[in-house]
Each structure stands twice: as C-alpha cells, then as structure tokens.
Amino acid sequence: EFAVLMGMLVAWTGGPVFLSLARRLRRLPATSALRGVLRDWWALARLGLLLLFPPAAVMVAAMSLIRNCAPLEGAALYLLIPGMGALFIAAVVLLLSTAFRRRAGWVLFVLLFALLAQPFVEILTQPQLYAYNHVFGMFVGLSWDQLQPPLGTLLLFRCLTLSFVVMMLAVTAALRSLARPSRASSRLALAAVFLLGLLPAALLLRQADALGFRNSETHLRTVLHATLRTEHFDIHYDPASVPAGDLAFIADEHEFQFSDVRAALNIRYDRRITSWLYPDDETKGRLFGTVTSEVARPWLAEMHIGIDAIEASLRHELVHVMAAEFGPRYIGV
C-alpha cells in the first residue's frame, strides 16, 4: 500500500515539477533530437527517483524494527511500483511538453485523472478485483485476502511500461526533429527505436489476459467454458471440476434460492443472473483476485463463487445481487 501511495504522489506532485523543468531542459543544446530527449528524460526521471528516496529511507528504518517484514521483496516492490512510475511520468511529461507546449499542464492534469480512473473502471466493468496501472503499478484487490503481490506478473507488466516509455521517447524526439533539418539516417534511427518499444508492447498486450494483467469476460469464459442455463441463471463452470450428477443439484439450488430470496425481499427481479463457479481457490485468486472471498457484483447481476462454497455462500451473494433493486441506480450497492 505504501509503494502504491508513493507512486500516486510522484505522479501528482512530481508531474507539475517535471513539466516546469522539462521546459527549461529543452532550451539546452543537443547533438541530436534523440540524445537531447534521452538527456532530458533521465534528468526528470532522476529527480523523481530522488523524491522517492527519503520515504524509502524511513521505511527501511521501520522494517528493521519489525521482524515479519521481507526487506528484499519490499525493495523490489518499491522499485517496480513508484520507481518505474517515475520513469513513466517523466516520459509522459517530456512528450506533452513537446507536443502541447503551453497547454501541456492541462493535458497532463486530464491524463493523470484518466490514469487514476482506469483501475476503477476496469474493476467495475471486468470480472476482476485487481488492476495494473502504469503510474502506480498495481492494485492487488478489493477483498479480505492478505496475499503477497504477484511479483512475476508485476515485473512483466513493468516491461510493458518500459515499452511505452521507449515509444514516447521516440515520438518526442521525432516531434523535436521536425523543428530542425534531419538526415534520413536519423529518421530511420527514430523509427527503429519506436519499433523497439512497439513490438514487445504489442506482444504483451496480446497476451494480457494470459499473463494476468487483466481478466476479461472472454478470457474467463475460456477457463469456465461450460454453461448451464436455467430459468433465471447463466451458470459458468469448468466441467472437469463438476461431476455430471451434480449439475441438477447446482441448477436446482440456484433456482430454489432465487425464489426464496425474491419472496423474502418481496420484489420482482427480471434480470438474468450470471454465476461464475470456480473449480478451486487458486483459480479464483489467479483470475478474479481473491482466494478467501465469494463476491457479488450487483451492478452486473453476477456472482463469483467457489464450487465448494455453493451451499454456504450462494444465498448470501444472491441477496446482494437481488437487493440491488433497493440500491442506487446503475450501481445497486
């Protein structure tokens, strides 16, 4: 949580400072547009990393007094979350200051809001409780789990962040070169740098679901690929984890609890409800983002439940979904 907070602070407090410094750095002479961009980017990034040093020193001192801390893992998270965020914001600021000049501050403000909103939009619209973000790295989930962050997935995501940094630096250099005569070899070099970022970015984005950066409904359907349809439900499950003889019980239990909850709430509920049944805790944690919790998402009329938790949790989650009739419109919580 501390690393995520520092990543957000560097973006919001460091961004305007970076913008002011970027305007001054641009006036310095450079032998080529690309070298000038790399020099300016590293100056901004170095400042961002320096801003992160004092809080890191305080945390190191605190961890030395707490026995259950993992200092190496904490250092890795700090480098990957706010550290990489500083490199990303430095590239963003450099590009905006070159492309928009006087309006760069307003564009940066809007972009930071969009980057801040992205995880919330993703969590609200996709079947996941976590999100990865180029500014603050990752948000590990809206659940009661006390799980270690997936460092491997975060490392791969930060490779995607670096790819975007490379592309932004190449575009910035290209924009600067428009203001001065440039050789064909220089233009080819910039194109090569851009492709150096584009190719890995395209590969990583193509595999985003499989790598764990996100969990789209399309991807979830490939894992829970069998569907049992009843009068009021679309029940998705992994057929390898559900004996054929249990399907009738699962369908009947869903419909029985639906009728019972509807009568108890004295409502008419017309939406079809989607029930995602996970074969085990590991699969639920990897795809949805929680191991210990069963979750209802009333605004989407869906439930995420472990196959072994149907009898214990189905009614509880169904109440959340159907009681949305009494909640605020569009959210229902």
Residues of each region from the PLM?
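Secretory targeting signals
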Residues: 42-104
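Internal/C-terminal transmembrane anchor helices
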Residues: 180-210
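Membrane-interfacial interhelical loops
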Residues: 1, 54-78, 113-159, 219
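Membrane-interface helix-boundary motifs at transmembrane edges
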Residues: 26-42, 97-105, 178-187
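Long, hydrophobic alpha-helical segments
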Residues: 1-23
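Central hydrophobic cores of alpha-helical transmembrane segments
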Residues: 104-118, 189-196
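Alpha-helical transmembrane segments
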Residues: 13-21, 91-95, 164-179
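Juxtacatalytic substrate-recognition/specificity segment
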Residues: 217-332
